[in-house]
Amino acid sequence: GLTQKDLVALSGAHTIGKAR
């Protein structure tokens, strides 16, 4: 399931991908 931790991790990974 998606916990707040998972959402933060996904959000962070997405942001890093966009930055690159």
Swiss-Prot record:
<dbReference type="GO" id="GO:0042744">
    <property type="term" value="P:hydrogen peroxide catabolic process"/>
</dbReference>
<dbReference type="InterPro" id="IPR002016">
    <property type="entry name" value="Haem_peroxidase"/>
</dbReference>
<keyword id="KW-0106">Calcium</keyword>
<dbReference type="GO" id="GO:0046872">
    <property type="term" value="F:metal ion binding"/>
</dbReference>
<keyword id="KW-0964">Secreted</keyword>
<dbReference type="InterPro" id="IPR010255">
    <property type="entry name" value="Haem_peroxidase_sf"/>
</dbReference>
<dbReference type="InterPro" id="IPR019793">
    <property type="entry name" value="Peroxidases_heam-ligand_BS"/>
</dbReference>
<protein>
    <recommendedName>
        <fullName>Peroxidase 1</fullName>
        <ecNumber>1.11.1.7</ecNumber>
    </recommendedName>
</protein>
<feature type="binding site">
    <location>
        <position position="15"/>
    </location>
    <ligand>
        <name>Ca(2+)</name>
    </ligand>
</feature>
<dbReference type="GO" id="GO:0020037">
    <property type="term" value="F:heme binding"/>
</dbReference>
<dbReference type="GO" id="GO:0005576">
    <property type="term" value="C:extracellular region"/>
</dbReference>
<keyword id="KW-0479">Metal-binding</keyword>
<comment type="function">
    <text>Removal of H(2)O(2), oxidation of toxic reductants, biosynthesis and degradation of lignin, suberization, auxin catabolism, response to environmental stresses such as wounding, pathogen attack and oxidative stress. These functions might be dependent on each isozyme/isoform in each plant tissue.</text>
</comment>
<keyword id="KW-0349">Heme</keyword>
<keyword id="KW-0376">Hydrogen peroxide</keyword>
<dbReference type="Pfam" id="PF00141">
    <property type="entry name" value="peroxidase"/>
</dbReference>
<keyword id="KW-0560">Oxidoreductase</keyword>
<comment type="similarity">
    <text>Belongs to the peroxidase family. Classical plant (class III) peroxidase subfamily.</text>
</comment>
<keyword id="KW-0408">Iron</keyword>
<dbReference type="GO" id="GO:0140825">
    <property type="term" value="F:lactoperoxidase activity"/>
</dbReference>
<feature type="binding site" description="axial binding residue">
    <location>
        <position position="14"/>
    </location>
    <ligand>
        <name>heme</name>
    </ligand>
</feature>
<dbReference type="GO" id="GO:0006979">
    <property type="term" value="P:response to oxidative stress"/>
</dbReference>
<keyword id="KW-0575">Peroxidase</keyword>
